[in-house]
Structure formats: structure tokens, C-alpha cells
Amino acid sequence: MDIEAYFERIGYQKSSNKLDLQTLTEILQHQIRAIPFENLNIHCGKTMELSLEDTFHQIVRKKRGGWCLQVNHLLYWALAMIGFETTMLGGCVYVPSACKYSNTMIHLLLQVTISGKTYIVDSAFPFSCQLWEPLELTSGKDQPQVPAIFHLREENGTWYLEQTKRQEYVSNQEFIDSNFLEKNTHRKIYSFTLEPRTIEDFWSISTYYQVSRTSVMTNTSLCSLHTKDGVHGLMGTILAYKKFNYKDNIDLVEFKTLKEEEIEEVLKSVFGIHLETKLVPKCGNVFFTI
């Protein structure tokens, strides 16, 4: 595995060799604009492999994306390779339909320490919940970013990531009441602790989410990729684009229903994904919103 091949994959030309916040932010932003969050292997009859070698091959060599257990694993490797003090953490994702956080740890995120200051780094959460910059590990502080205002709060050793989003204007009126739109201005995203994790801690949940009939990953084919001013999303046959703060503190949201035969070309042109086997698009109960 070659770190230069990773940098080429994300289109990053090192501006300096400093292990500082600017470099960390640049790498994060290049990754989220080059590597999609996606679970398409599950809907192509393939498995989502977790080993670093398999992840590197899929994302770097085959120019695919992956889910958090792959994409953030790759980012962990890259940051550690160039010398950042990096730790894997595990998170419990908020389930809106149940009004609670998942019972088990299902999300991989990263902690990075620079000159004694700690940040949360995450390159693999779908749509507008995605961080564009590292978050200071500080409780109760508003941290405005392009997608939204993010907040971290700590209670008894557990940290909670939340966001406050802008109002939205939906250009396609037939989607005005879509379940893919987040109805609440304030959104809970996930909780986590600072207990160090390894990729082996996620093996059993990875298997479960690939085979369980109730898993969001088996129920919905997902793809999400950020641009310099917004985010593209594909949920089943629904294509969406959100442009952040397009005017007067309002986000523009556009939807389009694709025909199945259009999906392959959209994956190539919008997300940079070339599939080797046929995708069976699926959209079950809506879990993620644009």
C-alpha cells in the first residue's frame, strides 16, 4: 500500500509537511470530495470487506467508495502513515424512528491530537451530516461549518454529536414532503466515547449489517459525495443534490427520480463509480436524510 497512491486518489498535492490543523483539514476535505460514502457492494451481491488491504484495493486502486468501516479505516491509515497521532473510536448512531441511539457501536470515527489539542475527524457519514472540518473536542461550543453548525456535548464520559441546519428550499414541489428531507432544524447524529478501538471491534457488526433484513444497509442502496458547495446523494433510484447556503441562509435541495437504466451512467458521471456487477437499487425505510 502506497501513501502517494492514496494522495493521488483524493487529488491531494501536499502544500507542506507540517502535521498541523490546516494539513488535517485539507486531507479531510479532499477525501470527502473524492471518495463516496456507499454500500453498493451489498446490492451487487458482493461483501463489504474490512481488512485494510481489501479496503485500499477497493477505494484506491478500483476508485470506489465504501462505508464508515472502510472509508474512515483508510483515513486512519493515511493519517497515521504521515505521522498524525490518530485513534479509532466507536459511535452509536441516533435512530430517529426509535428516538434513541443504537444499542451497539456501529460507526467508526477518528480522534486526532495535534500539539496537545484533540479533534474529532470523520469522513464517512452520509449527506449533510458529514463534517467538512475537524471538530474541536470541546463540550457545549457551536462550531459553524459549511454544511451546518455542529455541536459536541459531553455527559458522564459519553460525547454527543449534533447539528443545527439551515432552512431548505425544495425546487421540485412533488418532493416537498419527501421522507428524505430532514424535518427538524436540530438533529442528533451519533454518540461516542474516547475508548480506543481497533477494526476488529467492528467485524461482527459489519457482518450483521450486511445480512440482516432489518439493516438500513440491506434495505437501501446509498451513495453520497461532497462537492465544494454541496452534496450529491443517491438513495435507491432517487438522486438528490443539496447546495449549502445558496442564498439568505437557505439550502437548495433538488430531487430527481431516475429510471433504473439511468443509474449506471449517474454513478459514473456524478460519483465516479464504475460497477463490475449489476446493481439492484433498493430503498426501504428511510434512515438517512439529505
From Swiss-Prot:
Compartmental location: Cytoplasm
GO molecular function: arylamine N-acetyltransferase activity; L-amino acid transmembrane transporter activity
Residues bound to substrate: 106-107
Protein family per UniProt: Belongs to the arylamine N-acetyltransferase family.
GO cellular component: cytoplasm; plasma membrane
Reaction it catalyzes: an arylamine + acetyl-CoA = an N-acetylarylamine + CoA
Described function: Participates in the detoxification of a plethora of hydrazine and arylamine drugs.
Protein's recorded name: Arylamine N-acetyltransferase 3
Coiled-coil regions, chain positions: none
Chief place of localization: cytoplasm
Phylogenetic placement of the source organism: Eukaryota, Metazoa, Chordata, Craniata, Vertebrata
EC number: 2.3.1.5
PANTHER family for this protein: ARYLAMINE N-ACETYLTRANSFERASE 3, N-HYDROXYARYLAMINE O-ACETYLTRANSFERASE
Stored InterPro entries: Arylamine_N-AcTrfase (IPR001447), Arylamine_NAT_domain_sf (IPR053710), Papain-like_cys_pep_sf (IPR038765)
Residues that bind CoA: 208, 214
Primary gene name: Nat3
Keywords for this protein: Acyltransferase, Cytoplasm, Transferase
UniProt entry tagged with the keyword Acyltransferase: yes
Organism: Mus musculus
Catalytic residues, chain numbering: 68, 107, 122
GO biological process, one term: L-amino acid transport
